[in-house]
């Protein structure tokens, strides 16, 4: 059974921006890095497509899969 928890945090207004999205993303990345959820589940928790989540991981220099770019191209048969 899944349930949601609401967490209230006081943040100075000049830092707010799109804080809900940022917090969800940070939490999803953290869960992924700790091996608690898969990359697919983390993307879902962040409210992002898998592609967009992978782009975000790459931007943060986080490896989503244990392959180098060359190994991944070989595995997928891409030249």
UniProtKB/Swiss-Prot annotation:
Which named protein is this? UPF0175 protein APE_0890a.1
- Disulphide bond pairs: none
Question: Pfam family example for this protein?
Answer: UPF0175
Q: Which family does it belong to?
A: Belongs to the UPF0175 family.
Q: Which InterPro entries does the UniProt record give?
A: UPF0175, UPF0175_domain
Q: Which species does the entry assign this protein to?
A: Aeropyrum pernix (strain ATCC 700893 / DSM 11879 / JCM 9820 / NBRC 100138 / K1)
């Amino acid at each position: 059974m899944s349930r949601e928890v609401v967490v209230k945090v006081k943040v100075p207004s000049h830092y707010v921006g799109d804080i809900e999205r940022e917090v969800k993303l940070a939490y999803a990345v953290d869960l992924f890095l700790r091996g608690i959820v898969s990359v697919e589940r983390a993307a879902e928790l962040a409210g992002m497509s898998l592609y967009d989540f992978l782009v975000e991981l790459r931007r943060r220099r986080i490896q989503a899969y244990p392959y180098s770019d060359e190994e991944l191209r070989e595995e997928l048969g891409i030249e």
